[in-house]
Every structure is written in C-alpha cells, then in structure tokens.
C-alpha cells in the first residue's frame, strides 16, 4: 500500500513486498468478509478501497457488488496498480491518486473502505474527512486499523522483541500511529459518522502458517528507516532477522498479530 507522496508511510519497495501484502490480505480475509456481511454490501453497490496496494480487498468487494456494481481501488503506487490490474474482475478498476485529496467526485460511493491507511499516513482526521466526502448520503465509511501493542511471541525471544521495537519505532518515528485502533471508534464518532459499529479481531500465527514471517519481512521493508533512526545498526540488522526467523520456525512457537479494530458508520443524509 502506498498512501501519497505527502503521507508518512515508511515501507519501501523491495522484492517480496507484494507477496507479503497478499499473504496479509489472505490472513485477514475471513474477518474482512465478516465485516462486509455486517455492513450489508450487496449487488449493485459502488465501493472504493483507499490505499488498495496490489489489490487490497477489491476482490472481496467485487464478489458482493456483482455485475451490477462497481469497485474502485485507489493507490499512488503505479507498480502496485499494474499488478492489481492483471486479471482484475470486470467490475473492478484501479486509479492512481492521493488518499488525502483524490480527484474522485463527491458523494459517489455506497462504501468507502481503508485498511492500515489512517494509522500509517500521519493524519487520520484528514483522511477520514476525505473518505466521508466520497461517500454518498447514507453510505458507509469503514476502517480497519491496528493496535501494535498486541504483537507478542510465545515463548518470548530477544530477537522478536528487538524487531517489534524496530517496527513500532520506525512508524512512530515518521509520525504514524500503530495504536490508532484504541481511538478509532471515537475518531469515527467525532468525524460525524452515525450508527458507528466496532468489531475488533486478533490473528494468531503458528510456525506452519503463511503469516509466520510477518514481523521479519515487514521490518525488512522498513530497513532504511530502522537504520536511520538507530533502531538497529547495519551489522545487527541481518543477525536479528535471522535469529527471529529461526525462533519463529520452531514447532512450539506462536505469536499474536496486531489487534485490528474494524469501525464503520454511515454518512448523514
């Protein structure tokens, strides 16, 4: 996911980043489906996925919007969008644009969704107001955002803790907030959304699961920021990654991901 050139998203382009995002999306798909079911996304809806990256939830939205509906994925990253367009369903289109100030027309979507955007881009209030602008009167604005404090490994390991500190420190160091989940419900209400709903979930990962490499791989994508901020040195970086990966692949090791808060509400008519 790329937010905009004016945002604070510190994750870099590297080999494997698209695959990492697809694995993340697949792991979160059951809970995303549950949220979309509760919202009531149905045939004929017009839906927008803000910060869709190489696909985001556009596939899940496409299934529900059907042939009479429309799904738009918005992102700034041309390479992500090129990947997303390959094999996209007929009712899905992708546009390059800034999540803070897209050129999409006001009041044009039944659903505006963003995941891990408001927490990482540095100005969640501004992003939420743009999402509300794009929603139709009576339409739904939905967000999924993390609380990084629930990242925990069992049994504990020093390398895990160092990578966790590097991850949280890299985002906070550029003005992002990986604990936005804690205030997301209040943020939605303060923005004027009505009938605001709240559904948190927590992913648990074992050594054989596709998400097992999540923490090392995302810190790899933060390499420049991590080193610039002094969270790890050049020499420490590969050593800590290797030690953490070795621990995560032990059969008895498990870890919990972020707690993800799903929050959605309706735009007033």
Q: What is each of the regions a protein language model found here?
A:
Residues 100-111:
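A short acidic, Gly/Pro-enriched loop at the edge of an enzyme's catalytic core
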Residues 125-140:
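A short glycine-rich, Lys/Arg-flanked "PGG" loop and its adjoining helix->strand segment in the class I
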Residues 1-18, 22-23:
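N-terminal, positively charged/glycine-rich alpha-helical extensions of SAM-dependent methyltransferases
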Residues 110-125:
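A short SAM/SAH-binding and catalytic strip from SAM-dependent methyltransferases
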Residues 26-45, 60:
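Conserved alpha-helix/loop element of class I SAM-dependent methyltransferases that forms part
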Residues 142-209:
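Conserved catalytic/acceptor-binding region of the Class I
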Residues 179, 189, 197-269:
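Conserved Class I S-adenosyl-L-methionine
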């Amino acid at each position: 996911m790329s937010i905009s050139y004016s945002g604070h998203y510190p994750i870099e382009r590297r080999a494997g980043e698209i695959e990492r995002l697809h694995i993340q999306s697949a792991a979160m798909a059951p809970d995303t489906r549950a949220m979309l079911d509760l919202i009531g996304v149905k045939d004929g809806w017009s839906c927008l996925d803000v910060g869709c990256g190489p696909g985001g939830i556009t596939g899940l939205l496409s299934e529900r919007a059907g042939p009479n509906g429309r799904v738009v994925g918005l992102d700034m990253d041309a390479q992500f969008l090129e990947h997303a367009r390959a094999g996209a369903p007929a009712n899905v289109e992708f546009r390059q644009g800034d999540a803070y100030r897209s050129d999409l027309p006001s009041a044009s979507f039944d659903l505006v969704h963003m995941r891990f955007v408001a927490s990482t881009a540095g100005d969640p209030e501004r992003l939420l107001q743009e999402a509300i602008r794009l929603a139709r009167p009576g339409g739904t604005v939905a967000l999924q955002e993390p609380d990084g404090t629930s990242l925990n490994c069992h049994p504990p390991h020093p390398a895990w803790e160092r990578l966790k500190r590097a991850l949280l420190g890299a985002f906070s160091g550029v003005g992002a907030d990986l604990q936005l989940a804690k205030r997301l419900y209040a943020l939605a209400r303060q923005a004027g959304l009505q009938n605001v709903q709240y559904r948190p979930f927590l992913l648990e990962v074992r050594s054989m699961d596709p998400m097992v490499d999540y923490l090392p791989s995302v810190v790899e994508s933060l390499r420049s920021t991590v080193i610039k901020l002094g969270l790890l040195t050049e020499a420490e970086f590969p050593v800590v990654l290797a030690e953490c990966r070795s621990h995560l692949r032990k059969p008895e090791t498990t870890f919990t991901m972020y707690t993800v808060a799903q929050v959605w509400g309706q735009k007033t008519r």
